[in-house]
């Protein structure tokens, strides 16, 4: 079992009593145009009802990717549990070219054995298969892992279903209304990382998934902190007079970029995490904020209003050269996130009175508007670059939304108990 997931499981158990509303994905657009696939209900080898429906989890994962449309079990001509039982000819006419079969077996000491096979219908070939022996708490993780493997085999893209999201919830209560939460990417297994009577903002994952940087106001003004998720210990990074915000870990894990206004103007700074030394990156009278790292950990994208309105710029952290403006498409561009492969930006594009999430190709400069929701902000990209999570306004509430990076698939993640903001997608865990 991976160390980071042992740590997350311990936190999950610790905070079980604090679980309240859960984010749940609701598909809003894009399923009908996706690739049909069949995920046959898994055979259950046990004496009571299974604790989790593994096939349902895999189906949901594949559907949530926007690339697959699992058919309803009622349309399946048969329900085999192994590839050898599958009659490929019976599936012709459904538009399905791959079938997932499997079973879950109850064992001793609260352990379960999950097995699955992905079968190509045209040849009857088993494309991939695996087994997982897990305790009940890890059943969903095993299902997400199977989804990752199936997704990668069928698309060539590494799956991100076993990743997590961090986000801030402002609850409708007077006592400790602000919560920093982590959940599975699909909203299951949420737990509270930190509670406060004061606002919490801008969570950012370390590249190893073991820490979160964020902004709190415990001292009466903004402060940047890093919290170790295993121990719960909190390290204060910056608590200067004025604004302290917008933390971003470098991909190599050695540096943290952030924005400070300690000298009056809002500028980008960087801390070497080993030494604690802080270096100023931008130096101007304009507002410079929202840093996002390029994959090489040498360059930053950031938002600046040096041209009058917010636009996105690129800067070399070594101090060589001058900042380069990289957005020109709209009146305002901000809240940029550089894709993990460095090929595109996801940002908030403001044009013609609309504020939407957009994708800009960093080679061609082409811009595609991805969303049609209201007051979109703070986008965060999945580590496999296929999906974006962001916050928007719906019925006067702040909610989380998903959109695929091709713009074809959209989903809503409603939180029933409060305003949900500042989503941050984890790295691979």
Swiss-Prot record:
GO terms for cellular component: periplasmic space. Residues 1-21 form the signal peptide. GO terms for biological process: cell division; protein import. SUPFAM superfamilies: TolB, N-terminal domain, Tricorn protease N-terminal domain. InterPro entries: 6-blade_b-propeller_TolB-like, PD40, Tol-Pal_TolB, TolB_N. Part of the Tol-Pal system, which plays a role in outer membrane invagination during cell division and is important for maintaining outer membrane integrity. TolB occupies a key intermediary position in the Tol-Pal system because it communicates directly with both membrane-embedded components, Pal in the outer membrane and TolA in the inner membrane. HAMAP family: TolB (MF_00671). The Tol-Pal system is composed of five core proteins: the inner membrane proteins TolA, TolQ and TolR, the periplasmic protein TolB and the outer membrane protein Pal. They form a network linking the inner and outer membranes and the peptidoglycan layer. This is Tol-Pal system protein TolB. It comes from Hamiltonella defensa subsp. Acyrthosiphon pisum (strain 5AT). The gene is tolB.
């Amino acid at each position: 079992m991976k160390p980071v997931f042992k740590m997350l499981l311990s936190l999950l158990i610790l905070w079980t009593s604090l679980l309240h509303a859960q984010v749940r994905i609701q598909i809003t657009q894009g399923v009908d145009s996706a690739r049909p696939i069949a995920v046959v209900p898994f055979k259950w080898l046990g004496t009571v009802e299974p604790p989790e429906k593994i096939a349902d989890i895999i189906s949901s994962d594949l559907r949530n990717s926007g690339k697959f449309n699992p058919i309803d079990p009622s349309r399946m001509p048969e329900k085999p549990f192994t590839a050898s039982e599958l009659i490929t000819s019976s599936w012709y006419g459904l538009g399905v070219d791959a079938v997932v079969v499997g079973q879950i077996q109850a064992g001793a000491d609260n352990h379960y054995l999950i097995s699955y096979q992905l079968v190509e219908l045209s040849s009857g070939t088993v494309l991939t298969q695996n087994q997982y022996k897990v305790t009940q708490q890890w059943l969903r993780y095993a299902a997400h892992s199977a989804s990752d493997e199936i997704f990668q085999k069928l698309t060539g893209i590494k799956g991100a279903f076993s990743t997590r999201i961090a986000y801030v919830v402002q609850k409708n209560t007077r006592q400790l209304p602000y919560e920093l939460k982590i959940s599975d990417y699909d909203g299951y297994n949420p737990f509270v990382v930190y509670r406060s009577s004061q606002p919490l903002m801008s969570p950012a994952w370390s590249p190893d998934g073991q820490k979160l940087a964020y902004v709190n106001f415990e001292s009466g003004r903004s402060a940047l902190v890093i919290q170790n998720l295993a121990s719960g210990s909190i390290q204060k990074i910056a608590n200067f007079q004025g604004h302290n915000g917008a933390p971003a870990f470098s991909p190599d894990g050695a540096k943290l970029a952030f924005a400070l206004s300690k000298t009056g103007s809002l500028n980008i700074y960087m801390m070497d995490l080993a030494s604690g030394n802080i270096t100023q990156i931008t130096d101007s009278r304009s507002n410079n904020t929202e840093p996002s790292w390029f994959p090489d950990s040498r360059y930053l994208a950031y938002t600046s209003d040096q041209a009058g309105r917010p636009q996105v710029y690129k800067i070399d952290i070594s101090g060589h050269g001058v900042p380069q403006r990289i957005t020109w498409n709209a009146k305002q561009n901000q809240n940029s996130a550089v894709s993990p492969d460095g090929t595109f930006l996801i940002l908030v594009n403001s044009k013609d009175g609309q504020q939407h999430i957009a994708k800009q190709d960093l080679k061609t400069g082409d811009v595609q508007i991805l969303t049609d929701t209201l007051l979109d902000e703070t986008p965060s990209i999945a580590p496999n670059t296929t999906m974006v999570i962001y916050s928007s306004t719906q019925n006067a509430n702040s909610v989380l939304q998903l959109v695929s990076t091709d713009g074809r698939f959209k989903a809503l993640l409603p939180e029933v108990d409060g305003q949900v903001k500042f989503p941050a997608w984890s790295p691979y865990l």
